[in-house]
């Protein structure tokens, strides 16, 4: 997958870049596996803004993705590699030997005609899904379950993967994309390989309107608002806000730890590293 830069025929296209989509083999989705989604643009049931910076966007169909990969022992053939507007990674339409079609997350390198399989007896091969205790240490995996049978929840975005670092009793240690090391039950399923569309983060949006197509509205700083709208607002002329940075609801931000403890924290072996460049 490569990135194509547009010629600067207009000011808005000067830094504009798009994916070339050479891996995509089908444009129209498989209709039985699509659904209509009700987009609320960040509004609640009374029409009030519940999530800021969300607005109208292009229409899209929801693709029903199989995150569980629970058809054990039945081989499937990859029919198409498709674009999904609801996620950054590409998806693949697979047809099982019993005739059932399903969408799965497409790993990088998966091609039309490839055979994939799920289950403890599956081969260690790109696109196959196995329990973590059946996968060798050092293997790149994605779409990893946190709870047995719930479906993949970890490493589902474009180009992401986790690495199996160690096995200890009933648990397997995973190094996650955030550099966090976490223990997961050995019965949880994971898919071999890293996800497709790894150049997704290199795309330059290029113009404001393109973000509006995605449903993203502008982000306004608190110090330029009125006092009624934000704790940092108001003042005569340009001000610093007059206090430590806070959210619109008065909660400290920029360095203040807001992460709550939860029972699953005991499975974290090593916390994620801080991003010094942020």
Swiss-Prot record:
Residues 224-262 are annotated as: Disordered. One of its GO terms (molecular function) is rRNA binding. It comes from Leptospira biflexa serovar Patoc (strain Patoc 1 / ATCC 23582 / Paris). One of the primary rRNA binding proteins. Required for association of the 30S and 50S subunits to form the 70S ribosome, for tRNA binding and peptide bond formation. It has been suggested to have peptidyltransferase activity; this is somewhat controversial. Makes several contacts with the 16S rRNA in the 70S ribosome. SUPFAM superfamilies: Nucleic acid-binding proteins, Translation proteins SH3-like domain. Transmembrane segments: none annotated. Keywords: Ribonucleoprotein, Ribosomal protein, RNA-binding, rRNA-binding. Belongs to the universal ribosomal protein uL2 family. GO terms for cellular component: large ribosomal subunit. InterPro entries: NA-bd_OB-fold, Rib_uL2_dom2, Ribosomal_uL2, Ribosomal_uL2_bac/org-type, Ribosomal_uL2_C, Ribosomal_uL2_CS, Ribosomal_uL2_dom3, Ribosomal_uL2_RNA-bd_dom. This is Large ribosomal subunit protein uL2. GO terms for biological process: cytoplasmic translation. Part of the 50S ribosomal subunit. Forms a bridge to the 30S subunit in the 70S ribosome.
